[in-house]
Amino acid sequence: MSAEIVHLEPGNLQHEYGLDTQRLQPWAVLNAPFESSWALARPRTRSVLHSHHEHEIFIAIRGSAVIECDGKRASFRAGDIAFLRPGLEHRLLNDGDEEFMFYSVWWDEEMAEKFIARNREEVPA
């Protein structure tokens, strides 16, 4: 058995929330209680200020940026992980001259319930 791998395709990114992204799902082999995506903040760009009902984690991969949450700013650079609570208004700012790449993972109760239901179907009794 070998690992299932999804490759980042920089030439095939979609524009979402003011960032260039590549979502992991749908991925037929993965039953997960979350959704996720690669995200690339181009130099001198900002994501759209927004909030949502999901929990979310950002994992900084390359470069540095600033996360703004409810009007407060914090530096965010490669190796850092940020947790964003549901309802928290947030955005990412890349005021630098280099690209900033991070990985975003989000989940909610409905995703967890669907995961449990699918998992019960997949595992023999």
What is the role of each PLM region?
Residues S64-V66, R73, E89, E99:
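Structural motif
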Residues V48-L49, I67-E68, L84, H90-G96:
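Short beta-strand His + acidic residue motifs that chelate non-heme Fe in jelly-roll/DSBH
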Residues G71-P86:
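Short acidic-glycine-tyrosine-enriched beta hairpin
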Residues L40-A41, S51-I67:
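Short, conserved beta-strand element in jelly-roll/cupin
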Residues M1-F34, V48, A117-A125:
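A short, N-terminal "cap"/entry segment at the start of jelly-roll beta-barrel domains
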Residues A39, F83, E98-K114:
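A short hydrophobic beta-strand segment most commonly corresponding to one strand
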